């Protein structure tokens, strides 16, 4: 029996990598809605049904763990250690902001600037870093940056994490909580402690949107208390915890809390059940989207497979399974019975018959999953307003790569997914999350490696052996089209539109970091007009877009790679104009000065001459 169970398990999980979702009208109608729990008992009942689904299938790695944006707390909370701050005698005309997905919605990162000061948290994830003969204690440094002649450390806050800056309030977010400081006095103004895990955050319009994750408490699933702000616990009642109307695989509860960035006052909160490691958080200027992947009833999966392959088993097996599906027992019990019936069949066979059956079962399952690829794994999308009210829910086939797989534009949500690891889709959803347009089945035998949407145009990179670069015309939401395609060696993991006619791709080729400039002046005929291979095996930009900086005024961009920093011009093709040796992790610009920042020092360059005009040792 173990061998047959293994065949079924391998067929159902390893080949497909996920589970069939029955395509039935009544289920489709249920999927498109959200509701809240009325009581802890209803929550527990939902969790019990969800457990039936997940019991047979392990958590499958899908996209990058987009929600796992974790930071470790540093030293115990303490006062900043300020020094005298020189008076500001000049004001810069311009300064850079963190490279974010949606312009105007800030994202946490290790470096922030207000045009005069740099706030830098070198080690947001750990308490101590060991360098030869040195220990570095994690802190957040306050650095007078402008003008470069005043470059100096003016304070040190004994907290570290990813940073957000709103006017004169610096927020430090780590796995323990949020610590907000006045940038002028460097004194704490408010704080919050996480009772669960920190997931991600956004800053928009003076409001801080924080996403946390709380593991389920089956004994007392609600209310939940995700965080404590200024000593007061935030409590989410059952009536503010949303769930899909049908049970899906869940193991955690996500909470979005909206706070005033200056005071920490909690303005609203909402929770939503989901699955850890398989959810993506995306925020536009109109809504917050939370996604998760669902897995359908395994008994229905096997029943449908056998129904579509009637010659694989005798009639008595099919009839018993059909009758079994009407029993009022759990899905898990049904699946155990189905596997027992199939083992009975296997035991009745001769060795030759058994060998043929096992091979047929395995291969037909593979064909079955190909046929039903878009019904196998679903990405469910829940939409909440910025006032944290539920606005709808729906699903699309496949799985997301990361947050860049989602984009809202003119009231429509564009979603890029990979289906069954070897083909890809694009869906356009309206404000009610109804699918109004789609492209299916491009990049065959490949999966998505990079996505970037920009207004009416989209760019998608897929990869297995070559790097197809697809250009999408999204001007008509009901009829999106692939209008251009280019195949080149290697792949891009990050795409950035440099200007109207140019897209930069950052990726890899033959083990090295590769930069590609794509000419999109003719959307129907994209071209790789220039490429550059760095003698580095990795760049943080491949997995973290915050590490990238574009200065369009000077026609340059910065990226870290390996342990070094690189500055390229792009006006007349890719030209390396500056390479900075050693621990360069971020860059910012203030007026015409480029500051290259690393754990040990900050170097300042004049962007007109590229001469070094300042340096500050941080250790």
UniProtKB/Swiss-Prot annotation:
Give yes or no: UniProt keyword Signal: yes
Q: Which residues form a coiled coil?
A: none
Q: Where in the sequence is the signal peptide annotated? A: 1-21
Record InterPro entries: Beta_propeller_containing (IPR019198), Quinoprotein_ADH-like_sf (IPR011047), UCP006425_b-propeller (IPR014441), WD40/YVTN_repeat-like_dom_sf (IPR015943)
Q: Which UniProt keywords apply?
A: Signal
User: Does the record carry rRNA processing as a key word?
Assistant: no
- Identification of the protein by name: Uncharacterized protein AF_0817
Q: Which organism is it from?
A: Archaeoglobus fulgidus (strain ATCC 49558 / DSM 4304 / JCM 9628 / NBRC 100126 / VC-16)
Q: What is the lineage of its organism?
A: Archaea, Methanobacteriati, Methanobacteriota, Archaeoglobi, Archaeoglobales
């Amino acid at each position: 029996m173990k061998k047959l169970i293994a065949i079924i398990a391998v067929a159902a999980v390893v080949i497909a990598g996920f589970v069939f979702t029955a395509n039935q009208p009544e289920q489709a109608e249920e999927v498109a809605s959200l509701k809240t729990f009325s009581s802890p008992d209803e929550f527990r009942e939902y969790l019990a049904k969800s457990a039936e689904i997940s019991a047979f299938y392990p958590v499958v790695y899908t996209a990058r763990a987009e929600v796992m944006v974790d930071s470790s707390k540093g030293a115990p909370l303490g006062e900043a250690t300020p020094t005298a701050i020189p008076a500001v005698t000049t004001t810069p005309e311009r300064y850079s902001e963190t490279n974010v997905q949606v312009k105007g919605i800030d994202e946490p990162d290790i470096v922030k600037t207000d045009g005069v000061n740099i706030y830098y948290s070198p080690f947001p994830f750990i308490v101590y870093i060991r360098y030869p003969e040195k220990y570095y204690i994690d802190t957040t440094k306050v650095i007078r940056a402008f003008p470069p002649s005043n470059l100096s450390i003016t304070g040190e806050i004994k907290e570290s994490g990813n940073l957000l800056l709103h006017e004169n309030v610096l927020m430090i977010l780590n796995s323990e909580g949020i610590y907000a400081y006045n940038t002028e006095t460097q004194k704490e103004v408010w704080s919050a402690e996480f009772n669960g895990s920190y997931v991600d955050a956004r800053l928009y319009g003076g409001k801080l949107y924080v996403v946390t994750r709380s593991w389920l408490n089956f004994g007392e699933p609600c209310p939940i208390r995700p965080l404590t702000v200024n000593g007061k616990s935030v409590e989410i009642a059952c009536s503010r915890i949303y769930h899909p109307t049908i049970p899906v695989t869940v193991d955690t509860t996500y909470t979005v809390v909206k706070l005033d960035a200056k005071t920490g006052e909690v303005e609203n909160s909402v929770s939503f059940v989901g699955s850890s490691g398989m959810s993506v958080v995306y925020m536009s200027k109109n809504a917050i989207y939370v996604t998760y992947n669902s897995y359908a009833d395994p008994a229905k999966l096997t029943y449908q497979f056998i129904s579509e392959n009637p010659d694989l088993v005798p009639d008595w097996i099919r009839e018993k399974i059909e009758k079994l599906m009407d029993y009022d027992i759990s899905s898990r019990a049904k699946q155990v019975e189905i596997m027992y019936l199939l083992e009975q069949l296997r035991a009745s066979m001769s060795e030759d018959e058994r060998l043929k059956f096992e091979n047929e079962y395995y291969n037909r399952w593979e064909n079955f999953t190909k046929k039903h690829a878009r019904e196998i794994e679903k990405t469910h999308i829940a939409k909440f307003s910025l006032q944290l009210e539920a606005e709808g829910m729906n699903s699309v086939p496949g799985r997301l790569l990361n947050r860049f797989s989602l984009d809202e534009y003119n009231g429509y949500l564009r979603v890029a997914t990979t289906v069954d690891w070897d083909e890809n889709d694009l869906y356009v959803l309206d404000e009610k999350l109804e699918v109004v347009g789609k492209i299916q089945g491009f990049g065959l035998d490949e999966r998505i490696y990079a996505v970037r949407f920009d207004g009416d145009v989209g760019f998608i990179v897929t990869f297995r052996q070559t790097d197809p670069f697809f250009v999408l015309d999204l001007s008509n939401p009901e009829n999106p089209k692939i209008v251009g395609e280019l195949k080149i060696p290697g792949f891009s993991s990050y795409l950035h539109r440099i200007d109207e006619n140019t897209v930069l791709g950052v990726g890899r080729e033959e083990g090295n970091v590769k930069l590609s400039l794509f000419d999109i002046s003719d959307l129907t005929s994209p071209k790789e007009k220039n490429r550059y291979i760095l003698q580095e095996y990795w760049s943080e930009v491949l997995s973290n877009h915050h590490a990238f900086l574009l200065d369009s005024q000077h026609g340059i961009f910065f990226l870290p790679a390996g342990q070094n920093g690189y500055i390229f011009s792009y006006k007349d093709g890719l030209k390396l104009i500056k390479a900075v040796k050693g621990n360069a992790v971020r860059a910012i610009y203030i007026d015409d000065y480029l500051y290259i920042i690393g754990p040990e020092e900050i170097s300042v360059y004049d962007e007109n001459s590229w001469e070094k005009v300042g340096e500050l040792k941080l250790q």
